[in-house]
């Protein structure tokens, strides 16, 4: 798999089947990289420039001030879930968020993730919306870098997000801090397909189903960002990346079409 920085241009809605969604997952590095509002402003500009703006945006390492700025500049609604209070340069909270290009958005709840080895607080947060009358739940998460925490946190995310599959299609975007060859990601495979692993090509030395051949790397020399989609609910799944000069991650853009209701 080769990192591609070419700007992805998605086709307009008129060129795609009904129910086709664009989904964006992005770790802004909103506090540690010191770019303050520049990373949020660049993201808003790129979203606005797209022929088809993403219906779902999942964000990590985000300051509440940046979240508010995105909502002020984009026709989106959503939910910000803090993980560390008053962490950011402007005194605002630090956390994860889900944005949806619709006013039909309600919080579906959050869950604190286990950390048997200790470390920074981690969470998964979800919102409920609908696409052409069909229920959709979108979740965002950011997992720990310590392998001792990864397995239990992935399992908790899979359980929390998977519970919504009874009555909704589900999207989970996040920085999982694990490369595709890691067995720790296995719990997500049971109920989800990863957008960047939907082809028949495989990364060298990797035979796992999620080690797809698309250019979906982030961070930016290895893949740790993912968009997972509930199995059986989506067709035509694909993913690409674009550049992000103010972050140490690259935006991961997924495209998928909702399948007929189960």
Which sequence ranges carry the predicted segments?
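Structured beta-strand-rich core segments of catalytic domains in phosphoester-bond hydrolases
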Residues: 58-135, 240-243
